[in-house]
Amino acid sequence: MDDLRGANALLTGAAGGLGRHIARALAAEGVRLALSGRHAEPLEELRRELRQRGAYAELVLADLADPGQTAALIEQAEAMVGPLDLLVNNAGIEAAAAYSAFTDDELAVMARVNLIAPMVVARHALPGMLARGRGHIVTVSSLAGRSGIAYDVAYATTKAGLVGFTRSLRAELAGAPVGASVICPGFVARDGMYARMRELGVNAPIALRAVEPERVARAVLDAIAHDRPDLLVSAWPMRPLLAVQELAPRLAERIVAATGAGKFFALLAEQSHRNAPSQPPPWPRADQEPPRVTM
C-alpha cells in the first residue's frame, strides 16, 4: 500500500508508549484511526493530541483478555472509522519472572492477550479486506519471539507464536491483495520492560541497547508501504545471530551468555519481584509484579 492517506486503521494497544508513537506515525500519513485500549483517559488524551494535528481519530474501548470484547472489536472500529484497510496488532503484556512462579491463570491471560486476541481480531478483519481488494495486517512481536529470553518465557513464547502466525498467514495470502507483516523490536526506549528496568535502577548490558520508539513506528509504515514479511528493529544487526542460532545453537547460546543477557534478565526478574505491589491486577497473585500493559 503506497498511499495511506484516507486509509482506515485499527490500532490496538494505542495508549501504551509504543502505541502512541505508531498512532502519531500513521496519523502523519493521513490515516483515519480507531484507537483501541482498555482505559479511556490515556486514549482520550492521545485522540485530542492527534485531532489538534488535524488527524481523524476515534476511540474503541476493549479488554483483549475478554473473548467477547475481542470478537466485537472489528465491528466497533468500522462503525467509528469505516471499513478497515489496516490492522495494527500492538497490544500486549509482559512480566519478568521465573517461569515456575507463574500460575496457570497468569499464563492463560498472557496467551489470550498476546497471541489469541491478535489472531481473532485479524480473522474478523480479513474477510472485509479481501472483499474490498485492499488491506494490510501488521503485528508487533519482539526479538524475544525470535531468539528466546530467560525469565520472560511466557512472553517470548507468545511473541514467537505471533511470528509463526504472521508467516503462515502471509503464505496463505500469497497473490492476494492483502499483506501481512510482523515487526520484531528489541528493547524500546521509554516503554515496556525497558522503562520498568530504568525505574528499578537495573542497567542493561550494551548488547541490549534500546531503540527509540519512533524507529519502531517507522518500521510499521515501511512494512505497510513495501509489504515487508518481517522487520527486526534493534540497535545491533540481529540476523547474523539468528542465523547462527539455527545453524549452531550451542554456539549461539555461548554468544548470548557472553553478553550478560541471562544474568541481566535474572536480576530484572528479582528486582521486579521485590518491588511488586500488594495487589497487581489482572494477575491474581499478590507476590508478583503485574504485567506491563501496552494496551
Predicted regions mapped to residue ranges:
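Residue(s) in the substrate-gating loop at a strand-loop-helix junction
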Residues: 142
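Conserved glycine-rich cofactor-binding loop
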Residues: 8, 13-16, 39
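Substrate-binding pocket helix/loop in short-chain dehydrogenase/reductase
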Residues: 98-108
